Amino acid sequence: MAPTLFQKLFSKRTGLGAPGRDARDPDCGFSWPLPEFDPSQIRLIVYQDCERRGRNVLFDSSVKRRNEDISVSKLGSDAQVKVFGKCCQLKPGGDSSSSLDSSVTSSSDIKDQCLKYQGSRCSSDANMLGEMMFGSVAMSYKGSTLKIHQIRSPPQLMLSKVFTARTGSSICGSLNTLQDSLEFINQDNNTLKADNNTVINGLLGNIGLSQFCSPRRAFSEQGPLRLIRSASFFAVHSNPMDMPGRELNEDRDSGIARSASLSSLLITPFPSPNSSLTRSCASSYQRRWRRSQTTSLENGVFPRWSIEESFNLSDESCGPNPGIVRKKKIAIGVIFSLSKDEDENNKFNEFFFSHFPLFESHMNKLKSAIEQAMKMSRRSADASQRSLAYNRIVDALNEFRTTICNLYTMPRIGEPVWLTMMSGTPEKNHLCYRFMKEFTFLMENASKNQFLPALITAVLTNHLAWVPTVMPNGQPPIKIFLEKHSSQSVDMLAKTHPYNPLWAQLGDLYGAIGSPVRLARTVVVGKRQDMVQRLLYFLTYFIRCSELQETHLLENGEDEAIVMPGTVITTTLEKGEIEESEYVLVTMHRNKSSLLFKESEEIRTPNCNCKYCSHPLLGQNVENISQQEREDIQNSSKELLGISDECQMISPSDCQEENAVDVKQYRDKLRTCFDAKLETVVCTGSVPVDKCALSESGLESTEETWQSEKLLDSDSHTGKAMRSTGMVVEKKPPDKIVPASFSCEAAQTKVTFLIGDSMSPDSDTELRSQAVVDQITRHHTKPLKEERGAIDQHQETKQTTKDQSGESDTQNMVSEEPCELPCWNHSDPESMSLFDEYFNDDSIETRTIDDVPFKTSTDSKDHCCMLEFSKILCTKNNKQNNEFCKCIETVPQDSCKTCFPQQDQRDTLSILVPHGDKESSDKKIAVGTEWDIPRNESSDSALGDSESEDTGHDMTRQVSSYYGGEQEDWAEEDEIPFPGSKLIEVSAVQPNIANFGRSLLGGYCSSYVPDFVLQGIGSDERFRQCLMSDLSHAVQHPVLDEPIAEAVCIIADMDKWTVQVASSQRRVTDNKLGKEVLVSSLVSNLLHSTLQLYKHNLSPNFCVMHLEDRLQELYFKSKMLSEYLRGQMRVHVKELGVVLGIESSDLPLLAAVASTHSPYVAQILL
């Protein structure tokens, strides 16, 4: 079964995906493994199927002519192609005969200046390919069909297009009407009134799901038999469904364009009905249904021509003699020959299907060139004209080959700034630092002639996808933005086409969310590659789009262990919390988890002590613990809390110092050995434990929060899925914390298991994508319970901290001294499970790191050993009265640090909290993290919940005010999963090229690639030649799902320090490609103010937030402008300056931003 759209593109690290690399490498953003693809692997074959003469091969680029030394085209060595003309008559028997009257080629005989005609044999697969193209399309069907075929042996991928050409006796009526009937949507009564049908909707939807619709006629028995999986699914097979059409007046016969949903083509689990509803004809359903009955294969194969068919051309006129109008079908096939390496084939297949709109657009351009060549050939009987027509096809083929190969092989920017921020990278602090470093460099070295402000002005004016990212919460959504992120007429399309994130991403990149719709791209020209690359990296912050994440839907009864490799099912016998009966709890955990208790002998001494700290592993020798020791554990007034994501240790105050290297070697081999209860979970970072603050409150305190913040100078480790230089702030209300019920059963009845299962996607974009690196299932929030051997049931009253994270590895160690754990009287009616507390009226309220005080420190001298993901709080002799729980009398003030994490990662701290009065809830210690700076609360901002290191603002907030203002936002952001199903997010270890956001942001390219949204080139020679034709092509054959009013290209010349904007609506004049950009004063002030903040040693994170705030100001000014212009027809620029304080230089930018939310602004100002 072929892969779907969002399946991971490359299975190996050598593929197109960005390899794992050190983000500190200044050039890491521009390293992208380049796949190999030769232009000769692309083959073009053109057929015509005439009602009288049968099927002919007009052009085949794979057939070499007899005179090998003759070159027909000047463009390359791959131009030894078959001659244009009806040279190969395909007969039903499979034989082929050469027709010498039409094929032309240049003669090498100097004496004979006239063109000679030569015949050549047809290729061996001509019959087969012809059957595949025409196979199930009846001659009566006048529409255009687009099909994709996968040939297994030899591995080939074919994209074919069949369209109708009408011919007559007169020259004017010959091929002048070479247009697809899809384009005639009842707009002209003299043109075809065929139905508006599309093919690609259903066809791509079935690729990889099942094998559909074999060709109507069997393949020729004369040729070799090949295994062919044809993905063709035609409109004649579809049932009438409610599918809206779109306005078309040009050659836009793209089935994808009509579907307005690319993702549905690749992930629909059933054949999508493909019919499009003609706007002005309500009876199209009936006509489509009749045609489906008469042409469907289920009803048998009908004769090719029948006077009974309702789609003959007898009532149409294309010339003075409509009675003798003849009809031809032209088929264009582009065949991609794949390598024998299966991995390479998979890479190209994924690239092809994920970028299909681009392939289809270039296919349409090739089709137009072939049409023009055919017209030229038919208009004249002169052999020279036919040779010229042939050369045109060769030229168009070479251009197609070059474009596709460049699109596939050119380098990309490996780590775009905005997308990397949105993906929740653990390197966010370093990312901000690098961005500000590049920003400072460019402001100091690229500001000549106001180059950088002009470029940013042009980018913000045309690439408008940044506007929704700075909108504050609570603002009404941008109508046009929402339309671009869904299908047109979404209510009707939703019946068969789901939401299309890939299409939304493509529209974002091109900035096509304004009104009128403009498609923008940016090209940086410069001979200094380093400068160009740095500028490209900087621009990826402003050219934004949505990030894509792949999810799999698990239906009822589907085994999660199959979908989640390495997971293991564990069960436990639980006593009912209401009834007395027992029930079995089945949970999942990772195979490599500590739950398996497969401790290595290397980390244990013979007496079951820890190799690192010489502390006994309780789980290994729990039987040797005396009853007296158990009582000591229960009655101890010392509390040992270990805060960890992977390793939890409880050590004595006199823990010995260990070699960090030795610890690192074995740090993944520890296993937890004792039982614990999860009560309240607080997302934390880490800080030196001696700086941790414990609140002092009464015994009946509802909640006490113990936070830790680790050293800020720790190294990052991309092999883990958390943050390295900051803490994760997870904004979740109390009702979003996943409760964990804990058992009251004895240890003998337990089996190791995981509690808590939150498979629905997290609304926090940062946290959703942090488990990428280690393929950790980030939707599982699982506290751990470990077996304790023969410990009595009253041991259940002990409380320790547990780890609640995506990973299941938790290591716990217990000191040699009697384990001094706080006790919780299980007989107390208030000591109920967190599950009960969660649903109780006076439930626990849990706060994030935003609300907990901490002090940062750089002191790391007291660390005894180093364990990844572990933070230990150990007791010392000196104590202080810090009442934490009912059963905790004292808590150590001067805690030693036994083991600290090698890097700063997201931690969860679970603390025991009994029920009590709510008065103490106001006594909670409030904290402001370093990111607590008044700023916009944009839901799309990648930095909204991020953190900084050196901002140094300790702002306090009351919990009530903290939650009160955002409770409504939380309610709106709740995602309710489908009943009986769960969404599993597939975490790609590395970003792949299968999404437009990373594949269309090009690096420094050797030649111009028209499809790239952003790219750098060294020379503008070829760029100048093809720019205007590319812009015109973008308007005529849009890759988006709607007509494009204008295509623009921002040209930044770093050699001349100029910024111009070329438009499809303006012609090149005075040797200039476009119009000079007017620098916006708002943008100039934005850049300079951000630079000044950074020069005053403010943190890079704060500077980036300031930049976001200034961008938000642009949005508010555009709102102010739109409100002022509402209801007015014309407004003078001076009036805007006096009333609104808007300068004339800012008007184009603000008008473009306003067009995203107020379309009428464009009618007044633009």
UniProtKB/Swiss-Prot annotation:
It comes from the Eukaryota. GO terms for biological process: B cell apoptotic process; B cell differentiation; cellular response to starvation; immature B cell differentiation; negative regulation of cell population proliferation; negative regulation of lysosome organization; negative regulation of TOR signaling; negative regulation of transcription by RNA polymerase II. Residues 486-1092 form the cDENN FNIP1/2-type domain. Phosphorylated by AMPK in response to energetic stress. Phosphorylation by AMPK in response to mitochondrial damage promotes inactivation of the non-canonical mTORC1 signaling, nuclear translocation of TFEB and TFE3, inducing transcription of lysosomal or autophagy genes. Sequential phosphorylation by CK2 promotes its gradual interaction with HSP90AA1/Hsp90. Priming phosphorylation at Ser-938 is followed by relay phosphorylation at Ser-939, Ser-941, Ser-946 and Ser-948, promoting its gradual interaction with HSP90AA1/Hsp90. GlcNAcylation at Ser-938 by OGT following dephosphorylation by protein phosphatase 5 (PP5) promotes ubiquitination and degradation by the proteasome. Residues 929-1166 are annotated as: Interaction with HSP90AA1. InterPro entries: DENN_FNIP1/2 (IPR037545), FNIP_C_dom (IPR028086), FNIP_fam (IPR026156), FNIP_mid_dom (IPR028085), FNIP_N_dom (IPR028084). It comes from Homo sapiens (Human). The keyword Cytoplasm applies. GO terms for cellular component: cytoplasm; cytosol; lysosomal membrane. GO terms for molecular function: ATPase inhibitor activity; enzyme activator activity; enzyme binding; metal ion binding; protein-folding chaperone binding. Changing residue 938 to A: Impaired phosphorylation by CK2 and interaction with HSP90AA1/Hsp90. This is Folliculin-interacting protein 1. The modification Phosphothreonine is found at residue 294. Zn(2+) 1 binds at residues 608, 613, 615. Residues 611-612 are annotated as: KY-finger. Residues 1102-1157 form the dDENN FNIP1/2-type domain. Residues 783-805, 915-925 have a biased composition (Basic and acidic residues). It is found in: Lysosome membrane; Cytoplasm, Cytosol. Residues 37-478 form the uDENN FNIP1/2-type domain.
